[in-house]
Swiss-Prot record:
GO terms for biological process: response to stress. This is Protein SprT-like. Its cofactor is Zn(2+). The active site is at E68. It comes from Staphylococcus aureus (strain MRSA252). The keyword Cytoplasm applies. GO terms for molecular function: zinc ion binding. Disulfide bonds: none annotated. It comes from the Bacteria.
Length: 151
């Protein structure tokens, strides 16, 4: 799937499910890491994570598009477009747009560092490096030490 096919898919879904046209750009953005897609407020464009298509196929992309189109149409109409707004919740339920997409990598797979407590030996895995002078064990308040760097 390329950007042209994605653009047509977004335009068709907008007409079918919302009865309104999509007049901006939709494209894949390979820099997206932790989200399936996003709606850009300033340019009104929609970006989709290509990894979602590679891992879960076209059905996952359709669900992400529906979710982002809810943001798009509500924002254009001047209604509540954020996840917390009732307008968004109502519209996403009407069109069958999910609140979340499937994650590509679990936290365990993304983790880079493993720490342990010197007192109770509790294990902590983290994506980002932790300042062991400032952070303490959540169980016993003991000191943390880096056990190993995973990647």
């Amino acid at each position: 799937m390329n950007n042209e096919i994605l653009q047509r898919m977004v335009e068709n879904l907008s007409e079918e499910k919302f009865g309104r046209t999509f007049q901006h750009r939709a494209y894949f953005n390979k820099r997206l890491r932790t989200t399936g897609g996003r709606y850009l407020l300033k340019s009104h464009d929609i970006e989709i994570n290509p990894k979602q298509y590679e891992h879960y196929g076209e059905d996952a992309v359709v669900k992400i598009i529906l979710h982002e189109l809810c943001h798009y149409h509500l924002h254009i109409a001047g209604k509540g477009y954020q996840h917390k707004d009732q307008d968004f919740k109502r519209l996403s339920q009407q069109v069958g747009a999910p609140r979340f997409c499937n994650s590509i990598e679990s936290y365990q797979q993304r983790a880079n560092y493993e720490y342990y407590c010197t007192k109770c030996h509790a294990k902590y895995i983290r994506i980002r490096k932790v300042d062991t002078n400032r952070m303490r064990c959540g169980h016993c308040n003991g000191k943390l030490r880096m056990k190993r760097q995973l990647k």
